[in-house]
A protein has these predicted regions:
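Helical "lid/coupling" subdomains associated with nucleotide-phosphate turnover
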Residues: 53-65, 203-214
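Small-residue (GG/TT-enriched) beta-loop-alpha framework at ligand/catalytic clefts
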Residues: 2, 123-213
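C-terminal region/appendage detector
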Residues: 8, 35, 76-86, 194-197, ...
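Short glycine-rich, Thr/Ser-proximal phosphate-binding strand/loop in the N-terminal lobe
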Residues: 28-56, 191-204
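Gly/Thr-rich phosphate-binding beta-strand-loop-beta motif of the actin/hexokinase/Hsp70
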Residues: 2-43, 165-191
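Intrinsically disordered, low-complexity acidic/Q/S/K-rich activation/interaction tracts characteristic
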Residues: 1-28, 44-59, 71-75, 84-90
Length: 214
């Protein structure tokens, strides 16, 4: 079962429909998207939450296929499409230690990988770091069939850029909460001091990881 948690249409008429932009984010918990115009004004935002977190990219794809069949807003043409993969299959590697031909080795200590996994990276220029991660290839393929070429990123790349580029001299502790995971980001002096993503099921899990980080 898929519950549509939020569907918000904002009265921003897009005169030139060829200039529509689409942003999509998905995880094991749900799916959301927003459309905007050439000035990046949001025209529509929708969020769907899965009744239970799914445990594989194959099950996410089935959920997305259901949504795409009924969501008319996703059946339009778009000038650009951005896809955000939200998962815990990532790690940060400073540029001075990064070698693209060794990319698989950076995940082996924190993520269970197999030989056929596609491993990619986002270039985080604002902190001289690469964000190495595993995207869900089957979902990328499905979206390519629907929209053609698009840009994709890991959710933590966007989160870190937003928080670090606006940080100041003070110590900041941020929590970004999803249905079954949450990110903790600690910054100071426009630098990253700590980042991790945690799974949780109970409020005790949530409190434990926060206290552990503090």
């Amino acid at each position: 079962m898929i519950k549509q948690l939020v569907k918000k249409k904002i009265t921003k008429h897009i005169e030139d429909t060829s200039k529509r932009k689409l942003s999509i984010q998905f995880s094991l918990d749900g799916f959301s998207f927003c459309t905007s115009n050439a000035s990046d004004e949001v025209a529509e935002f929708s969020s769907y939450v899965f009744e239970k977190s799914v445990n594989s990219p194959e099950l996410i794809l089935k959920k997305l296929q259901e949504i795409f069949k009924t969501e008319k807003s996703l059946q339009n043409d778009f000038e650009s499409v951005t896809v955000i993969h939200q998962n815990n299959l990532s790690t940060l590697v400073p540029n001075q230690y990064f070698k693209e031909d060794s990319i698989a080795s950076y995940l082996k200590y924190s993520v269970k990988t197999i030989a056929t996994d596609l491993i990619v990276f986002d270039d985080l220029e604002f902190m001289d770091t690469k964000n190495v991660y595993i995207p869900y290839v089957n979902i990328n393929n499905f979206l390519f069939q629907n929209f053609g070429e698009f840009e994709f990123k890991h959710h933590s790349s966007i989160l870190l850029e937003k928080l670090i580029t606006k940080s100041d001299d003070s110590l900041k502790f941020y929590i970004n909460i999803s249905q079954s995971t949450f990110d903790i980001v600690v910054t100071k002096d426009s630098k990253l001091l700590f980042y991790n993503i945690f799974d949780y099921q109970t409020k005790e899990d949530f409190i434990y990881y926060i206290l552990f980080t503090l």
